Amino acid sequence: MPLSDTQKTQIRDGFAHLRESLQPASLAFYEAFFRRRPDLRPMFRDDLAGQGMRFMATLGLVVDALDTPEELAERLAELGRGHAALGVKAEHFAPMGEALIDTLQAQLGAEFTPEAEAAWRAAYAEVARQLVASGQLA
């Protein structure tokens, strides 16, 4: 991911703060997502707590691999293929990204500066790009 060292630090610091309240943050994330796309709710299991924690675990993998994107690429390729099998489309990633930004704003408060937001947006855009490409999502 073409992120500066400052951006990587902002992402790591933000995720460290988010780790303090992962369960509520993960639920807030899916609430924000389904506010944007209620039509997609049937694609998800009833266990949103578990789904949310899986999302946060994946987010943690991304954060941990900021300096080694080649290691992350294999995992993202696998995830992209899995998402394709579930019927996920490329268009689903934009509202998910906005839900992530909403969640970070709510959880991090003043820590979530415009610069931190730009860093998170850049990282998410690259992850989404890789997922879409590897899953050949339409």
Model-based region annotation:
Residues 1-138:
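Globin-like tetrapyrrole-binding proteins
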